[in-house]
Amino acid sequence: LPIHRFIAANNANDIFYEYLQTGKVDLILANFTVTDERAEEVDFALPYMNVALGVVSPDSNVIKSLDNWNSKDQMIVISGTTAETYLTQNYPDIPLQKYDSYATAKSAMENGGVAWANDNTEVIAFASQNPAYTVGIPSLGSQDTIAPAVSKGNETLLNAINDEIKALGKENFFHADYEATLVDTYGTDYEDSLVVEGGETSAQ
């Protein structure tokens, strides 16, 4: 699959949809969780990563449960993410402090935020890079997957990507890639729980 050009995109659903639907890009490779709602807008290929939600908080007040949440505290989330949806549906009494990007949410956490709910990959990485924080809840809600996305109905590209993912799985490519690029970010303890090899996962 020759890639001619990479285009940076903010991690926001509407941007992903727009870029695919207008033909600005043919393929989205991002921290884009597969959901039924999103599958109405795009076609997802086979997954390459497992993901759940997680919650990170300061070491001075590690949040290990969302039960008995202090109603005066706000949970940081990024607008349009599965974290926002999950908390709105399952913990409607938790006030949400919403931001439009990872950078602004990260800044809010670093500047006195009580807790931040996001994909567990994101909060694990944040805590590993910021020693004063702990992932008190490493898995919240159901386990989902992250997968490439193409515009709705682009079966030719979708099939080509799926074939490539299956072929790479036979080489153990995704584990090797994790070890080469992500161990410093997530650590070895999370490798087998995060990596999906050859598109095969029970979370599909």
Where are each of the predicted segments found?
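Extended ligand-binding regions for polar small-molecule ligands
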Residues: 1, 60-63, 73, 79-82, ...
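Ligand-binding cleft/hinge of the Venus flytrap
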Residues: 1-6, 82-101, 128-129, 180
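Extracytoplasmic small-molecule ligand-binding "clamshell" domains
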Residues: 1-31, 98
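A ligand-binding cleft/hinge motif common to bilobed small-molecule-binding domains
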Residues: 14, 21, 30-41, 89, ...
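Hydrophobic residues within well-ordered alpha-helices
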Residues: 19-21, 69, 108-110, 148, ...
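Extracytoplasmic
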Residues: 22-23, 39, 43, 50-52, ...
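Flexible hinge/capping segments at coil-to-helix
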Residues: 48, 57-74
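Periplasmic-binding protein-like
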Residues: 49-59, 124-166, 184-203
